[in-house]
Structure formats: structure tokens, C-alpha cells
Amino acid sequence: MSMHYEDYMRQVVEPMRRELTERGFKELLTPEEVEQYMESAEGTTLVVINSVCGCAAGLARPAAVTSLAHDKHPDHLVTVFAGQEKEATAKMREYLAPNPPSSPSMALFKGKELVHFIPREEIEGAEPEALIRRLAMAYNEHCE
């Protein structure tokens, strides 16, 4: 790929990154960062597989952020960006097995155990409030 294209894509996705990072999500940019985080994870973690698609912009990111206002919420927030940090995303997807690759998607972990997963096909066409409720129910069940 040309350097011009890569620079352009970095500029395009920056606001999409900030939508999560400015609200407390830590970006995991390399496979090593993903592995280091996941292998030492304690408590609960919400993972957002970010994406440039419309359902990420209109549904997944806003639902993830809004869900954090719930009384119970995850201890930690992390994100990887599909299509941007491909190796980091591939590494995170290993922890999401047996679920097939899906972006955007949201996952709740308790320690290293995947306890709740929302794939793209359940995000597309959903009402934002329904996604927020679904996350809140998972938080009620798994978060302190």
C-alpha cells in the first residue's frame, strides 16, 4: 500500500479511535500488548473490536460508551481496531474463539474467560437502546 493511502486512513480513523479512547478505553496496538493484557487480566473487561463501518459509528461505539453509565460496569476497557492494527486484532480474536471474526463486536471478559459476546450481525439493525440494555444485563450478571 502507498504511504499516502496509509496516512489518509490514519487521519480518517482518528476520530473513530478517540470516540473510545477519550472515554477511558485503552488501545491495544500490537499482538504483544493484547497478549500481555489478556494474560494478566483481572476483574471484568469490556473489549470493543472497533471498525470503520456504519454500524460501528452509529451503534457499537455509542452503545459501548453509553452502557458505562450503568450502576455496574466493567473494571477495564480495551479496544483493538479491525483493519488498522490487523495483527493485534487477530490476536484478540484468538481470545474470542470459538466465535468467528466479527467487526465491530463487543465482548465481556471475567479474567480471561469470555462471558458475553455481541457479534456484528447482532449489532447491525439493532436499536442502540437494545444494545445498551444487553450490555447492562451482562454487567449485572458479571460485574461488581
Swiss-Prot record:
One of its GO terms (biological process) is cell redox homeostasis. It comes from the Bacteria. InterPro entries: BrxB/BrxA (IPR009474). It holds the Pfam family Disulph_isomer. Belongs to the bacilliredoxin family. This is Bacilliredoxin BH1716. The lineage of its organism: Bacteria, Bacillati, Bacillota, Bacilli, Bacillales.
